[in-house]
């Protein structure tokens, strides 16, 4: 089930990083981000990666040149991406639309897609070679908002890797931008979907007022020492594949009385429970599961087509670790469903208000775990003219945030993959517990009395 992040040896020859600016003049202005955008929990860089095969129909065309030129054209419409972030009163983030541009790296690798093999997955072990961390480019304020590297392969394919300042967009907004680059690369002069800024739609009310309980932003100070922060340098990475058999085994553990539940709900509950068991959390510690929910079109909350800002919230459910670990999977699923049920127009407004009232706090970290379902985000659909990628998805998870992505394993089986970061001994226990949970299980039989 697990795909270890094993070493992969090949060399990459990179050119000096360039700045790509909008192809035409753009407005010089300062635009505020929304109160959903600029919270502390969005102030990081999110990496994505896409692997493309050689396409005989594109013979003679250089993906580096095609994408670089299309990028400049797309930035005319998405000109805020070519600016730099600044911070105002109460830590309010704004983008100074300077037109300075984004970072772009041209590269060549002495390998092929076939040789990459199992590296074509989340937690790609060679990612640092495929997206060079340009010194000084990772700060949230004053740095380029996007970094792109296009790496040609010996087979004629290529790899597109990108890093985005998450305060600017979520996955849906990023895909909208990438689709525009793809359209420009294939000859369009105007995007089929024009970008909309309008970040004020997700600003706090006046006056702001917190009207909902937000477990995802609670300050946790007193713990029993089993909810420790994790140092990324001491963690190991694994990607876990869930095919038809694993999903069936998990569903066979559920009673009919639970009712309908999605594959994502089942996986989220399973990973959360196994992870908590692996950490050997004190039974009396409070743990929480946070659900990332895209608010576009949900519960009557309409955002205009083309809106490319962050448009998601992360409602959470809490329980004692002992309750989560000793109860069957059904218990965890009900908590996942409970968190998702918090989503409403009022909940969204309450989050924005909380950001202003409490100074844009970071989400709760001790005892928290979050999984985002990006299977419908469209990362596997972006076409620069060479067709859809062999794989497209988030390149890295975070210690307490992971992602569910669609994936086809080496056997050709389609399923879901979830990358995980954990300390080595915890990872070993997590994998053992996950194997136990996904073994072929007996169907639950409930009494008819």
Swiss-Prot record:
K(+), Ca(2+), Mg(2+) and Mn(2+) increase enzyme activity while Cu(2+) and Zn(2+) inactivate the enzyme. Keywords: Acyltransferase, Transferase. The active site is at 166 (proton acceptor), 383 (proton acceptor). Its EC number is 2.3.1.232, 2.3.1.196. It catalyses: anthraniloyl-CoA + methanol = O-methyl anthranilate + CoA; benzyl alcohol + benzoyl-CoA = benzyl benzoate + CoA. Expressed in berry outer mesocarp, but not in berry skin. Belongs to the plant acyltransferase family. This is Methanol O-anthraniloyltransferase. It comes from Vitis labrusca (Concord grape).
